[in-house]
């Protein structure tokens, strides 16, 4: 039986994963900025779940929640960085405050959580980070400059952490979901505050698309939760766990595109070393 620690479990992927973890027979520490939004979950599963207040933008909040959870459960095996939200708008339309807040939540927040949990994992010589990425980090969209950039940065940072902490038995998996039927668009998508009409055909078009498909996304969050559990149970979990047909097709197209560009510019870029 494993003990999971999941950020952002008030709704969406986080709540779905916490429910699946309980059904799997494991224990879970559920967290949210507003504790009242997860207390109902603990009420449903009082023997397997405990709730903790956590804000990924506040280091002291993270440390306190992790320490309390470890004290209550005795051990933490899996730490899931799920808390986050989107920001839609062309770069020129986003305020400094919006950019910094989004990056603080989606990039710096997971780094804070991993940094705080690493001493626990290192001390017990084992642990698994599950970091929620985004298809926008495979290749980005007009309108997701800040959000996709933050998620891509988190993915690359996770790769470094995986290399740094591997000698201690620590594993890292970045989950890359396509469009899943959660409340992300309705409840977790911030809009840029400085709209510029000339971006209507790019960033504006993407926002319209997101609003149109909301509630019709092909991805099943319950199936995604089972895939994440399977990765945690695997002896050789993937670093990148791509979820859903859309994300798989997108990843393959991007790999083909990057290889073609690499090959096309090899005659220019390759012969730039000193001649020995």
Question: How should each PLM-predicted stretch be described?
Answer:
Residues 134:
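Residue(s) in the substrate-gating loop at a strand-loop-helix junction
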Residues 10-12:
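Conserved glycine-rich cofactor-binding loop
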Residues 167-238:
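SDR active-site lid
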């Amino acid at each position: 039986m494993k003990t999971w620690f999941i950020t952002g479990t008030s709704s969406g992927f986080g709540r779905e994963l916490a429910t699946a973890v309980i059904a799997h027979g494991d224990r879970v520490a559920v967290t949210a900025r507003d504790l009242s939004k997860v207390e109902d979950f603990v009420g449903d599963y009082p023997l397997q779940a405990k709730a903790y207040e956590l804000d990924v933008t506040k280091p002291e909040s993270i440390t306190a929640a992790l320490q309390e959870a470890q004290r209550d459960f005795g051990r933490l095996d899996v730490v899931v960085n799920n808390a986050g939200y989107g920001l839609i708008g062309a770069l020129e339309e986003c305020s400094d405050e919006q950019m910094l807040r989004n990056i603080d939540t989606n990039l710096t927040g997971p780094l804070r959580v991993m940094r705080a949990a690493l001493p626990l994992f290192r001390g017990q010589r084992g642990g698994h980070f599950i970091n929620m990425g985004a298809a926008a980090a495979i290749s980005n969209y007009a309108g997701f400059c800040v959000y996709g950039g933050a998620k891509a940065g988190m993915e690359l940072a996770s790769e470094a952490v995986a290399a740094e902490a591997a000698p201690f038995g620590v594993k890292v998996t970045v989950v890359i979901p396509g469009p899943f039927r959660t409340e992300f668009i309705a409840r977790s998508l911030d809009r840029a505050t400085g709209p510029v009409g000339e971006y209507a055909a790019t960033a504006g078009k993407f926002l319209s698309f997101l609003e149109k498909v909301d509630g019709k996304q092909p991805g099943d969050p319950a199936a995604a939760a089972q895939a994440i559990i399977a990765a945690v149970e695997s002896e050789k979990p993937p670093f990148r766990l791509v979820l859903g047909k859309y994300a798989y097709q997108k990843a393959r197209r991007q790999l083909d595109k990057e290889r073609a560009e690499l090959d096309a510019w090899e005659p220019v870029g390759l012969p730039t070393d000193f001649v020995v």
